[in-house]
Amino acid sequence: MRLIIAGGGTGGHLFPGIAIADEFLARSPENEVLFVGTERGIEARLLPKLGYKLALISASGMKGMGTIKKIMSAGRLLYGYSQSRKILKEFRPDLVLGVGGYASAPIVLAARGMGVRRFIHEQNAFPGLTNKVLGRIVDGVFISMPEAESFFPKEITQMTGNPIRKEILWGFQERVRSVGDTFSILVFGGSAGAQRVNSALLEALPHLEGVKGKLRITHQTGEKDAARVREGYQAQGVQAQVLSFIDDMSAAYGAADLVVCRAGATTIAEVTACGKGCIFIPFPYAADDHQRKNAESLVHKNAGVMILEEDLTGERLAAKILDLMEHPAELAEMEKNARALAQLDAAQAIVAAMVTKNQERDKDKENQRAR
């Protein structure tokens, strides 16, 4: 069987696609996967290094653009649709899966026009406009959070969770805490870092003076901010490992007592799988404010706490950190609730559902020929 996985742009869209690809390829040595993305997305840099096949098309968003840019974007979408039809003809997939991002729409639309089985995966609690539209023309919709269910046709929507990279699932080992031990904090703002989160941590340090000796911080800053953040920790005398990018996230999660992070869908999936208590700082400019809605989904279940960026100060962040340090039972309860929300078999569920749909279609064709 052949599968096209379309989308990307950010790690939040791409990493679930990689998890699905790995599961699909593991099912049969004859299976093939082709990713389709854009040259500006993270997929163009990452997928060739990981050994996956990748085709590039022209696509961009329209939201928030002026009239001229919207016209240009529409032109790119039409060209991307033409490119998508060519890719479908050459690769001849049995299945197409859109995982979000600019490349998702042209491929799924082209698949509909050519009669190819097509699906989408929605990572967030609140879907964007593209997936809301595509949800009406696909054979199946896979959602990560129950809040998204109301936006799609009930008869084709399945709650699967958000697929997690195998290196996170297989490599995670939680450290054993002991009384009087150090307190380890993992800080990251997504695959590219987040300058506002970085600054908030540095601003919080003077308010953590009484516990500085206990703190051990691992901080993913993004490439542009690493030097500034490293100097900030050194000036405050806090032991911190500052990295532009963390390659081994499973080890980083395993060592952490607390995570300070954004609230993208992939982050949510990973921290729940690892059962981590989190202080979420949602990115305020995410489409349709979906990061805030993602975080609220966990906060309402006592599986995390949230500080909106508009309310973010070093003092407020320090107060949250101190509160969780001083109340380990509350942190442990948060971890338990987060772990209960994890869906570790998301990739398997998605692949199984797509394969079953395809088999049903093949049987229908055979029955029609038999008549």
Curated annotation (Swiss-Prot):
Q: Which reaction does it catalyse?
A: di-trans,octa-cis-undecaprenyl diphospho-N-acetyl-alpha-D-muramoyl-L-alanyl-D-glutamyl-meso-2,6-diaminopimeloyl-D-alanyl-D-alanine + UDP-N-acetyl-alpha-D-glucosamine = di-trans,octa-cis-undecaprenyl diphospho-[N-acetyl-alpha-D-glucosaminyl-(1->4)]-N-acetyl-alpha-D-muramoyl-L-alanyl-D-glutamyl-meso-2,6-diaminopimeloyl-D-alanyl-D-alanine + UDP + H(+)
Family note: Belongs to the glycosyltransferase 28 family. MurG subfamily.
**PANTHER family xrefs:** GLYCOSYLTRANSFERASE, UDP-N-ACETYLGLUCOSAMINE--N-ACETYLMURAMYL-(PENTAPEPTIDE) PYROPHOSPHORYL-UNDECAPRENOL N-ACETYLGLUCOSAMINE TRANSFERASE 1
> What is the recorded membrane topology of this protein?
Peripheral membrane protein
Q: Where does UDP-N-acetyl-alpha-D-glucosamine bind?
A: T10, G11, G12, N124, R165, S191, I246, Q291
- Give the GO biological process terms: carbohydrate metabolic process; cell division; cell wall organization; lipid glycosylation; peptidoglycan biosynthetic process; regulation of cell shape
Q: Which CDD domains match?
A: GT28_MurG (cd03785)
Q: What is the protein's name according to its record?
A: UDP-N-acetylglucosamine--N-acetylmuramyl-(pentapeptide) pyrophosphoryl-undecaprenol N-acetylglucosamine transferase
Checking NCBIfam families in the record gives:
murG
Cell compartments where the protein resides: Cell inner membrane
Write the record's keywords in alphabetical order, separated by commas: Cell cycle, Cell division, Cell inner membrane, Cell membrane, Cell shape, Cell wall biogenesis/degradation, Glycosyltransferase, Membrane, Peptidoglycan synthesis, Transferase
User: EC number(s) on record?
Assistant: 2.4.1.227
Broad class of the protein's primary localization:
membrane
Q: Which residues form a coiled coil?
A: none
What is the documented function of this protein? Cell wall formation. Catalyzes the transfer of a GlcNAc subunit on undecaprenyl-pyrophosphoryl-MurNAc-pentapeptide (lipid intermediate I) to form undecaprenyl-pyrophosphoryl-MurNAc-(pentapeptide)GlcNAc (lipid intermediate II).
Presence of keyword Cell cycle: yes
The molecular function terms in GO held by this entry are: UDP-N-acetyl-D-glucosamine:N-acetylmuramoyl-L-alanyl-D-glutamyl-meso-2,6-diaminopimelyl-D-alanyl-D-alanine-diphosphoundecaprenol 4-beta-N-acetylglucosaminlytransferase activity; undecaprenyldiphospho-muramoylpentapeptide beta-N-acetylglucosaminyltransferase activity
Q: Answer whether the UniProt record assigns the keyword Transferase to this protein.
A: yes
